[in-house]
Amino acid sequence: MVPGRVLMWGALALTAVMSACGGEDIAADHVASYGLNVYQSYGPSGYYTHEFDGDEEFYVDLGKKETVWQLPLFSKFRSFDPQGALRNIATAKHNLNILIKRSNNTAAVNQVPEVTVFPKSPVMLGQPNTLICHVDNIFPPVINITWLKNGHSVTEGFSETSFLSKNDHSFLKISYLTFLPSDDDFYDCKVEHWGLDKPLLKHWEPEIPAPMSELTETVVCALGLIVGLVGIVVGTVFIIQGLRSGGPSRHQGSL
């Protein structure tokens, strides 16, 4: 990857519940980011997205020029024309070119991304599941996330979000991989970014409980047998005591 380039970040509107007295002291029940768009000279590339409570509501696929809903519920009562996003990206590109000409082109500081891999639900062998690769602290928003299975590149069954914005102006991105857990397979999430000296591999493999050894099984069976025999002996003793204590009372009652 080449060194970092200039990027422009435009955000139109933040909000949910605002008052006329300033927003810094307000605790809102819900927060939405509308019209978050980024364009950068590397590529060139960019993205446009709407977010709600930290989740991506939808993004616009700039290549296909269509709106892609990540929260389908919202698409039932609203729509978004992707042409609006394309106009915003074009404006950002124009402004970026002006800023480049007027600046000294000082490269932004490349942050080191933080990578975590975990399953969506508890792992059970043979039961379909999803692996999640959560990449945080991304800046600038140029990154490549791929999956490896047993050391080989995975070519299908995965998807990812666009860049999600954070309050500190860094970004996060999440990649999903559907898989069938097996004790013979292991996975790696491979992350490439300008903040890394070399690609980062985050390893994951299912944690399968180790089978009991033959000695352990023998001990467990022996303990179970002993407990069973003790139970039989104790039960027999109680029955005999009960018969002895009940004998005289039955004899006296017949007189």
Curated annotation (Swiss-Prot):
Task: Name the membrane topology term.
Answer: Single-pass type I membrane protein
Recorded hits in Pfam families, A to Z, give: C1-set, MHC_II_alpha
Provide the GO MF annotations for this entry: MHC class II protein complex binding; peptide antigen binding
Chain spans, region Alpha-1: 24-120
The protein's matches in SUPFAM superfamilies, at most eight in alphabetical order, are given as: Immunoglobulin, MHC antigen-recognition domain
Q: Which cysteines are joined by disulfide bonds?
A: C133-C189
Q: Name one GO biological process term.
A: adaptive immune response
Extent of the signal sequence = 1-23
Q: Does the keyword Cell membrane apply?
A: no
Region named Alpha-2? 121-204
Question: Gene3D superfamilies of this UniProt entry?
Answer: Class II Histocompatibility Antigen, M Beta Chain, Chain B, domain 1, Immunoglobulins
Keywords (A to Z) from UniProt: Adaptive immunity, Disulfide bond, Glycoprotein, Immunity, Membrane, MHC II, Signal, Transmembrane, Transmembrane helix
Every copy of the Ig-like C1-type domain together lies at 113-205
The entry's cellular-component GO terms read: late endosome membrane; lysosomal membrane; MHC class II protein complex
CDD domains per the record?
Answer: IgC1_MHC_II_alpha_HLA-DQ
Membrane-spanning segments: 218-240
Entry superkingdom:
Eukaryota
Q: Where is this region: Connecting peptide?
A: 205-217
User: What ranges does the Extracellular topological domain annotation cover?
Assistant: 24-217
Name the family the entry cites. Answer: Belongs to the MHC class II family.
Protein name according to UniProt: SLA class II histocompatibility antigen, DQ haplotype D alpha chain
The species this protein was found in: Sus scrofa
